[in-house]
């Protein structure tokens, strides 16, 4: 077994990477509140896993969406548990993200030279809120439908470009199948991809710059 490991280590420098990860200096002032970002990341992984599981049964059409959610909750083995974990983890992710932002702000973690780390974090915060807005509509029940109608109607107040933005979000003048398709695509592909990319950038910058010192 050691020969196999040595073969890979010679080519990929596995041990050097492992040593770098395990020997990173942690400042003495770090406490439990510095774990909030990691908890948010864990919630994101739970969201990806449970969301992926539900895509096998969910149908993104205005006719079948609600029925498919009911099927997940009542017929699929442990479907009720998977969807419940998805919902609970979503709430936890938003809460932990908010607390993480407050911790970084209060400890000055956004200051030079960590401005870009802060910027990527703000972008991920926007993505997190967008997850909530798009996911809320997917069951396509009364609450989801009217939430979409209200949210997509907000940009209409913007002068000149407002109506164009509304039509772009809805996929037409009114809320319908095109709207659900857009929100489903955003929720299951666009937003997860963007979040993963900015998370990678966020983590790499933290690894490079280290954790900010105490105030």
Curated annotation (Swiss-Prot):
<keyword id="KW-0813">Transport</keyword>
<keyword id="KW-0249">Electron transport</keyword>
<keyword id="KW-0408">Iron</keyword>
<keyword id="KW-0934">Plastid</keyword>
<comment type="function">
    <text>Component of the cytochrome b6-f complex, which mediates electron transfer between photosystem II (PSII) and photosystem I (PSI), cyclic electron flow around PSI, and state transitions.</text>
</comment>
<dbReference type="GO" id="GO:0022904">
    <property type="term" value="P:respiratory electron transport chain"/>
</dbReference>
<comment type="subunit">
    <text>The 4 large subunits of the cytochrome b6-f complex are cytochrome b6, subunit IV (17 kDa polypeptide, PetD), cytochrome f and the Rieske protein, while the 4 small subunits are PetG, PetL, PetM and PetN. The complex functions as a dimer.</text>
</comment>
<feature type="binding site" description="axial binding residue">
    <location>
        <position position="86"/>
    </location>
    <ligand>
        <name>heme b 2</name>
    </ligand>
</feature>
<feature type="transmembrane region" description="Helical">
    <location>
        <begin position="116"/>
        <end position="136"/>
    </location>
</feature>
<dbReference type="InterPro" id="IPR016174">
    <property type="entry name" value="Di-haem_cyt_TM"/>
</dbReference>
<dbReference type="InterPro" id="IPR027387">
    <property type="entry name" value="Cytb/b6-like_sf"/>
</dbReference>
<dbReference type="Pfam" id="PF00033">
    <property type="entry name" value="Cytochrome_B"/>
</dbReference>
<dbReference type="GO" id="GO:0045158">
    <property type="term" value="F:electron transporter, transferring electrons within cytochrome b6/f complex of photosystem II activity"/>
</dbReference>
<keyword id="KW-0812">Transmembrane</keyword>
<dbReference type="GO" id="GO:0046872">
    <property type="term" value="F:metal ion binding"/>
</dbReference>
<keyword id="KW-0150">Chloroplast</keyword>
<feature type="transmembrane region" description="Helical">
    <location>
        <begin position="32"/>
        <end position="52"/>
    </location>
</feature>
<keyword id="KW-0602">Photosynthesis</keyword>
<dbReference type="GO" id="GO:0009535">
    <property type="term" value="C:chloroplast thylakoid membrane"/>
</dbReference>
<dbReference type="InterPro" id="IPR005797">
    <property type="entry name" value="Cyt_b/b6_N"/>
</dbReference>
<dbReference type="GO" id="GO:0016491">
    <property type="term" value="F:oxidoreductase activity"/>
</dbReference>
<keyword id="KW-0349">Heme</keyword>
<feature type="transmembrane region" description="Helical">
    <location>
        <begin position="186"/>
        <end position="206"/>
    </location>
</feature>
<keyword id="KW-0479">Metal-binding</keyword>
<dbReference type="InterPro" id="IPR023530">
    <property type="entry name" value="Cyt_B6_PetB"/>
</dbReference>
<feature type="transmembrane region" description="Helical">
    <location>
        <begin position="90"/>
        <end position="110"/>
    </location>
</feature>
<dbReference type="InterPro" id="IPR048259">
    <property type="entry name" value="Cytochrome_b_N_euk/bac"/>
</dbReference>
<feature type="binding site" description="axial binding residue">
    <location>
        <position position="187"/>
    </location>
    <ligand>
        <name>heme b 2</name>
    </ligand>
</feature>
<keyword id="KW-1133">Transmembrane helix</keyword>
<protein>
    <recommendedName>
        <fullName>Cytochrome b6</fullName>
    </recommendedName>
</protein>
<feature type="binding site" description="covalent">
    <location>
        <position position="35"/>
    </location>
    <ligand>
        <name>heme c</name>
    </ligand>
</feature>
<feature type="binding site" description="axial binding residue">
    <location>
        <position position="202"/>
    </location>
    <ligand>
        <name>heme b 1</name>
    </ligand>
</feature>
<keyword id="KW-0472">Membrane</keyword>
<keyword id="KW-0793">Thylakoid</keyword>
<comment type="similarity">
    <text>Belongs to the cytochrome b family. PetB subfamily.</text>
</comment>
<feature type="binding site" description="axial binding residue">
    <location>
        <position position="100"/>
    </location>
    <ligand>
        <name>heme b 1</name>
    </ligand>
</feature>
<dbReference type="GO" id="GO:0015979">
    <property type="term" value="P:photosynthesis"/>
</dbReference>
């Amino acid at each position: 077994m050691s020969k196999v490991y040595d073969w890979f280590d010679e080519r990929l420098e596995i041990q050097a990477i492992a040593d770098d990860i395990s020997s990173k200096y942690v400042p003495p002032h770090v406490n439990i509140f510095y774990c909030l970002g990691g908890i948010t990341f864990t919630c994101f992984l739970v969201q990806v896993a449970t969301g992926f599981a539900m895509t096998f049964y969910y149908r993104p059409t205005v006719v079948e969406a609600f029925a498919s959610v009911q099927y997940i909750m009542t017929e699929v083995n442990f479907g009720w548990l998977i969807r419940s974990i998805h919902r609970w983890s979503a709430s936890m992710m938003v809460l932990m993200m908010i607390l993480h932002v407050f911790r970084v702000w209060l400890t000055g973690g956004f200051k030079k030279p960590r401005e870009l780390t802060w910027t990527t974090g703000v972008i991920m915060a926007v993505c997190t809120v967008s997850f909530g807005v798009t996911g809320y509509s997917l069951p396509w029940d009364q609450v989801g439908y009217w939430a979409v109608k209200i949210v997509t109607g907000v940009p209409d107040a913007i002068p000149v470009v407002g109506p164009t933005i509304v039509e772009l979000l809805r996929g037409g003048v009114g809320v319908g199948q095109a709207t659900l398709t857009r929100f489903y695509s955003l929720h299951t592909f666009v937003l997860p991809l963007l979040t993963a990319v900015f998370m990678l950038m966020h983590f790499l910058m933290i690894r490079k710059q280290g954790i900010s010192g105490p105030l």
